[in-house]
Structures are given as C-alpha cells and as structure tokens.
From Swiss-Prot:
Keyword match Magnesium: no
Organism: Shigella dysenteriae serotype 1 (strain Sd197)
The keyword Cell division appears for this protein: no
Localization terms from the record: Cell outer membrane
Gene: bamA
Positions in coiled-coil regions: none
Subunit-level organization: Part of the Bam complex, which is composed of the outer membrane protein BamA, and four lipoproteins BamB, BamC, BamD and BamE.
Alphabetized UniProt keyword annotations: Cell outer membrane, Membrane, Repeat, Signal, Transmembrane, Transmembrane beta strand
Stored InterPro entries: Bac_surfAg_D15, BamA/TamA_POTRA, D15-like, OM_assembly_BamA, POTRA
Membrane-crossing segments per the record: none
Name of the protein in its database record: Outer membrane protein assembly factor BamA
Cross-referenced Pfam families: Omp85, POTRA
One BP term from GO: protein insertion into membrane
GO cellular component, as recorded: Bam protein complex
Function field: Part of the outer membrane protein assembly complex, which is involved in assembly and insertion of beta-barrel proteins into the outer membrane. Constitutes, with BamD, the core component of the assembly machinery.
Length: 810
C-alpha cells in the first residue's frame, strides 16, 4: 500500500514538475495540508534543506522519509520556481477505540495487543496496521476452530481529522471434530491411541478433559503425545508422516487424519558417556544405568538428561550441555545411546536479592536461604530456599531467577521474586445446624508482625457458653541457628452445659513457653513448660466425671448441685514436626507430620499424659498440580498415671469443620450418663432418659457429649480446579470433594457395669460424611465453606450440614 502511494506521488511529481537532470537549488520549502504535525517536525524528518541542490533521487528520498513518519496518508512534492512545495494529507487521529461482539477475547487483552502494534488513542490511524490486526485476529479464531469468525474495523470520521475506531467481531461457533483417523497403526488400536488425546471425536459425559472443539494448539499437543507414546514403548523409528485437517462446507465440522509409520521395537544395548565430566563420571554413570534388554524409552532418556543436568547444577555448573544421540542398529533392533556432556563453566553467586517483599524485611527472607553468597551456585540449595520461603506462608508465589553478571564469565546473581499475601487475619467462624442454630467466634492473628517474621495472635471468643482470651507470640529465629521461642497467656470461662456438652463450668487460666529446635531441613523438635489453673463448679453427677473425681480422692455428692473442685498443674510439653510440604498454605505436594504431647510433672494435682498425631499428605496427579489427592489423619490418646484418670476436661472431641464435617462441633463420641440427681433444686428442664430399677431411677442417658480419651479421624479429599476462577486466583481459591470419618471413645468405660447403655469403649463406632468444600484466602483471612451429608451416624449425633468459617478456630 505504502509503495503504491509512493509510486503515485512520484508520478504526480514527475507530471507536475519540470527540471533538468542536474537538479535545482531549493530557496524555500512550503507545506500544504499540515494540521496536527508541526512544520518544524516535518522539516526535521526531511533529508532536504534550503540551499541544497536536489534531483530526482532526493525527491524520492524526501517522499520516503515523510511516509516513514507514519503521520501521512498521501505525500506530493511539487516545484514552484525555486520553492519546494510539499502537499500532504495527514492520517486521522484515533479519538476512541471500542469493541463489539468479542466474547472469547477480553477487551483488556485486545487493548494490549493494539498498543503493542502502536494503535492507541491519540495516535494516528495506520490503515495498513489495522488490516494486519484484522487478519491476525481472524487467524487466532481459526486456530481455535472458529472458521466462520470475522473481524472488521469500522472507522467513523469525526471533526478535526479525528476518527472513532471500532473492531466488530462475529465469532461464530467452534468447529467440532467429526472424526479422527490414524493411518498406519498396527501395534495399537486407533481408539487406544486417541484415548490419550485431549481432542476427541466422541466425549463421554464423565470426561472433563476431552474436548470435541478443534484447536490447532491442542492438536499439536496431541501429536506430541502420540509421538511420546510410541517412543516410550521402544518404537525408535516412529514418525508422523503427515497430518490433514479437513473442514466441512458449513465450516462447523472437522476431520483429522494422521498418517504414521510405526517401525519396529528397539531395545537398548548400552549407554556410552563422553565429554567434559569435570570429575563426576562415577555419579553420572550411576544415572545412566539400564536394565539388560530394556526397551528404548524416550521419556526415560529425557529424564536421564535432566537428572545429569540437576547433578551438575548442584556443583555449580549452571548451564551444562547434555545431548543424547541414539545410534540405531536396524539389523539386531537395538539402540546404543551416546551421551555427550559438557559441564561448561562453574558459576559462583555474587549476590542474592529479593524482589516484591514490600512488607517482609530482607533479613526474614535471607535467613531461610541455604545458598550462600560467594559460594558456587548449587541448584538444589536455591530450590531449598524457594521451598522454605513457600513454607513460611507469607507469599502467594515464589519464583527464582538466576541472572548472569554482565562482563563476568563465572558469576551470577540469584533473585527471589515473591508476591506477598495478607498474613494478618481477622478470624470469624459461623455455623448453622438444624439443632445447633447459629454459633460464631472471632480473633486476630498476624503471622508476619511488621515484616519481622514474628507470629502474634490476640484471640477471643464470647458467646452463650464461653468467654475466651489468648495472647501468643512466637519468634521463629530466637537464635541465628533457627531455635524458636514462643509464649502464650490465656483465660477461659467455659459453660459446658450451654455448649451441649456434659454439665460443668470450668474457669481456667495459664501460660506456657516453648522452645523449638531444628534438626535438619524438614524436622524440628519442641520442648517447653506450662502451667494451668482449673476451677471446676456446677458439676452434675455424670458417670465419667464422677469416675475422675473419685480417682482424685474426691467424694462428690449427687445431692449437691454445686460440686466444685480446683487443680493446679505443671506440664512438660513436647512435639516433633516433619514438614516437606511445597508451601505453607494451599499445598499441592508433600507431607506434614505433627506430634504434640504433654505430661504432668511433680507439683501437679493431676497426673496424666496426652498425645496427638496429625498427618497430611498431598499427591498431585497432574504436572500442573491442579488436581491433587489429600489424605489426612488425626490420632489422639491420653490416660492417667499413678492410679488417677486423665481429667475429663482434657478429653478429645470430634465433629466440625476441622475433623468430621457434617456433624456439629465436638458432638461425636460418648454421651453423658447421669446418676439420678436428688437435690431439691434439680432442674426439671433437663431432658434425661432415666432407667428404673425396682421403681426407682437408676441411671439417666442423655445426648450431651463428653468426649473420650482416645480419638481417630481420617479424611480423603480430592482437590480440583475451581470452576469460573481464572488462573490469576488459582493460588487463592481451592475447591475439594471430601470423605470424612472419625470416632472418639473412652477406654476406661466399663460396658459390663453399665449394661443396657451404649458401649462407649468401642472404637468401631465410626461416623462418616461426604461433601464439598470451598476455601478462599480472603483479605480477612482464610474463608472455609463446606456442605456435608452424614451417611453413617448414631443415636445422639447432631448433624450440621452447612459450615462456614473465617479463619482458624482454637
């Protein structure tokens, strides 16, 4: 188009001017048609100046130079005596850009592409560029199977040489694959091969991966899958000869034909390693061992190359070259693999830098590093630093970038790029059940106080049955070696009766201090001391509660409604944590095991021990870690020492959002069995089911939960991509389907003594539920929604199908 205008302008010039081949001297230069472009700017873009002697070539260069500015649609150069007359028609200025009909491509993406091509409001309109954009967008639609799509640019003139630019889209419908044919396959059926494709000619309703809508990019991926399928099974000569994609006349159907040559199966005869190995030949040979007669496998060859690169990367060879060349022997159907290795230069780390940590101090991140400045670059150490930063839970994403130092042949800078998340949370929990009604709690937690890495929490609960307050502080790096120090103060006024638990009141307060000791990269130990004062009152005559009081030398009375008891206990607290999760929140890979326990020490009124074991394992089932299987367990056991029982208020409970969803919090397990109350002020509202013997009340059964000294909970969860959520928020929102089970029992319950009542010592009374959960890392903290349906429950259990929590509970 531009060359055509240039030719026309040249012809006009030739017809409008007459001068000799020797040229003429320009005395003056005049412009006609300039509006937006200043005369000075136009003169600066021209190679001709007043006083110059010009000829035909100079005129042609002038026209080219003016067109090259992008400001003009037409240029004419005329001679008027000794004056050079330049007549121009300016390109119109874009006043606005709008889009219509685009559903597959968002406005923001279109604007970015237009700006990258120089098309933006305030710039001049280049019709050639617009035509290229039209074609490029149509090509994009064709690549995703929308062959009837069209994109037209509508230019509406406005006053003062301005225009409105509107891109009108008619996207049409995606062409569906009618049939996929593979020609030349003998070892495997066509159905078997196509079953590994994303594109399908038939998609069952349950297949969430397959797609009948044609996309050029997906077809390329499927062809690579086909190639890998054969190469991984020994077909070293496999080749895709050609691919034909045919479109039906109505442009709504696609036929795909893939012509292949399978060849024969080949076995590996050996691996030969050569090149510059930098003294690591023995380690490299360990990575290249093969089983005799093993089939050639392309994926294993690629993995072997990657393993060699990772090995060399640990020793500072950041950019090794590893090339495998299969030497095929068609006579005996074998492949000898020749691996050439060049380690390249050994690189050293000049600096470690952090980007994106606007809140967290550099020191908080730097102390997690295992790679040292000045040492050679170890890829495994860099990765460990990334893992440790992820496990902090302070960041949504952590990426690493190894940058060569300009002018240095053997130095790099390691850059950790982090995206911080809100580490503070306002905790608010709410639940609703047909029997429980509404329950809620609140608190504030900051895991990265002022960017120092300190965890500070101020938590509190105030409702019908509890007043709770807690202040906790943890310094994860009390010493430079990573020894942590944490402390806690708490007060709790708990009315168990109003919480649908066994009837008693406990006012307690206490403190504890804990030291944490790192053992290695993934293991740590904890040890500390604690003190707690418990003031029990209003204890109703409940069998398990009375059993504990008798073991403590007390003699409670069923005729006294205000039984009270006080204890002061000192405990030795201990723990062990194994943490190999890939990140601190929303993990997708790895395991975590946490063992906690406590035992009373001399000077305590009580004598008991208590142990809890929590495990969680995440197993990704795809390369992108979008589909993940999660298995969780929680085990708990406690008992008395020296003939005493573990206090009933230390019992384990199950049910609720953190254990078995679909059941009301803490209601799974043994229920209270009461002795007949003989006090004159006995509360008639208590709904006990009392057995009688010889006309007198014997024992009374209730639905009040009392917990037990043993607990087992397990959960199997399938984490899936969240529908309608873009990849931008994939790290903030998580959807899962779950199956929960659990039970609580009392090992000290004597079923022979209480015949006719449920055997609360039986651990096989397992409750089960299934449902769906949604988690969101919101600005307020983690939001958890779950809906579960109990499908195995027992008399007295209380269902709570929908549960909603903001933050964690304590």
């Amino acid at each position: 188009m531009a060359m055509k205008k240039l030719l026309i302008a040249s012809l006009l010039f030739s017809s409008a001017t007459v001068y000799g081949a020797e040229g003429f001297v320009v005395k003056d230069i005049h412009f006609e048609g300039l509006q937006r472009v200043a005369v000075g700017a136009a003169l600066l873009s021209m190679p001709v100046r007043t006083g110059d002697t010009i000829n035909d070539e100079d005129i042609s260069n002038t026209i080219r130079a003016l067109f090259a500015t992008g400001n003009f649609e037409d240029v004419r150069v005329l001679r008027d005596g000794d004056t050079l007359l330049v007549q121009v028609k300016e390109r119109p200025t874009i006043a606005s850009i709008t889009f219509s009909g685009n559903k597959s491509v968002k406005d923001d993406m279109l604007k970015q592409n237009l700006e990258a091509s120089g098309v933006r409001v305030g710039e001049s309109l280049d019709r050639t560029t617009i035509a290229d954009i039209e074609k490029g967008l149509e090509d994009f639609y064709y690549s995703v199977g929308k062959y009837s799509a069209s994109v037209k640019a509508v230019v509406t003139p406005l006053p003062r040489n301005r225009v409105d630019l509107k891109l009108v889209f008619q996207e049409g419908v995606s062409a569906e694959i009618q049939q996929i044919n593979i020609v030349g396959n003998h070892a495997f059926t066509t159905d078997e091969l196509i079953s590994h494709f994303q594109l399908r000619d038939e998609v069952p309703w349950w297949n969430v991966v397959g797609d009948r809508k044609y996309q050029k990019q997906k077809l390329a991926g499927d062809l690579e899958t086909l190639r890998s399928y054969y190469l991984d099974r020994g077909y070293a000569r496999f080749n895709i000869d050609s691919t034909q994609v045919s479109l039906t006349p109505d442009k709504k159907g696609i036929y795909v034909t893939v012509n292949i040559t399978e060849g024969d199966q080949y076995k590996l005869s050996g691996v030969e390693v050569s090149g510059n190995l930098a003294g690591h030949s023995a380690e490299i040979e360990q990575l290249t061992k093969i089983e005799p007669g093993e089939l050639y496998n392309g994926t294993k060859v690629t993995k072997m190359e990657d393993d060699i690169k990772k090995l060399l990367g640990r020793y500072g060879y950041a950019y090794p070259r590893v090339q495998s060349m299969p030497e095929i022997n068609d006579a005996d159907k074998t492949v000898k693999l020749r691996v050439n290795v060049d380690v390249g230069n050994r690189f050293y780390v000049r600096k470690i830098r952090f980007e994106g940590n606007d809140t967290s101090k550099d020191a908080v991140l730097r102390r997690e590093m295992r790679q040292m400045e000045g040492a050679w670059l170890g890829s495994d150490l860099v990765d460990q630093g990334k893992e440790r930063l992820n496990r902090l839970g302070f960041f949504e994403t952590v990426d690493t970038d190894t940058q060569r130092v300009p002018g240095s042949p053997d130095q790099v800078d390691v850059v950790y790029k982090v995206k911080e998340r809100n580490t503070g949370s306002f905790n608010f929990g709410i639940g609703y059940g047909t029997e429980s009604g509404v329950s809620f709690q609140a608190g504030v937690q900051q895991d990265n106080w002022l960017g120092t890495g300190y965890a500070v929490g101020i938590n509190g609960t105030k409702n019908d049955y509890q007043t709770y307050a807690e202040l906790s502080v943890t310094n994860p790096y009390f010493t430079v070696d990573g020894v942590s120090l944490g402390g806690r103060l708490f007060y709790n006024d708990f009315q168990a009766d109003d919480a649908d638990l066994s009837d008693y009141t406990n006012k307690s307060y206490g403190t504890d201090v804990t030291l944490g000791f790192p053992i290695n990269e993934y293991n740590s130990l904890r040890a500390g001391l604690g003190y707690v004062h418990n003031s029990l009152s209003n204890m109703q005559p409940q069998v398990a509660m009375w059993r504990y009081l008798y073991s403590m030398g007390e003699h409670p009375s069923t005729s006294d409604q205000d039984n009270s008891f006080k204890t002061d206990d000192f405990t030795f607290n201990y723990g062990w944590t194994y943490n190999k999760l890939d990140r601190g929140y929303f993990p997708t890979d790895g395991s975590r095991v946490n063992l906690t326990g406590k035992v009373t020490i001399p000077g305590s009124d009580n004598e008991y021990y208590k142990v809890t074991l929590d495990t969680a394992t995440y197993v990704p089932i795809d390369d992108d870690h979008k589909w993940v299987v999660l298995g969780r367990t929680r085990w708990g056991y406690g008992d008395g020492l020296g003939g005493k029982e573990m206090p009933f208020y230390e019992n384990f409970y199950a049910g609720g959002s953190s254990t078995v969803r679909g059941f009301q919090s803490n209601t799974i397990g043994p229920k209270a069995v009461y002795f007949p109350h003989q006090a004159s002020n006995y509360d008639p509202d208590y709904d006990y089911e009392c057995a009688t013997q010889d006309g007198a009340k014997d024992l009374c059964k209730s639905d009040d939960a009392v917990g037990g000294n043993a607990m087992a909970v397990a959960s199997l969860e399938f984490i899936t991509p969240t529908p309608f959520i873009s990849d931008k928020y994939a790290n903030s929102v998580r959807t899962s389907f779950f199956w929960d089970m659990g039970t609580v029992w009392d090992t000290n319950w004597d079923s022979s003594q209480y015949s006719g009542y449920p055997d609360y010592s039986d651990p096989s009374n397992i409750r089960m539920s299934a449902g769906i959960a949604l988690q969101w890392m919101s600005p307020l903290g983690p939001l958890v929604f779950s809906y579960a349906q109990p499908f195995k429950k027992y008399d007295g259990d209380k269902a709570e199908q929908f549960q909603f929590n903001i933050g964690k509970t304590w």
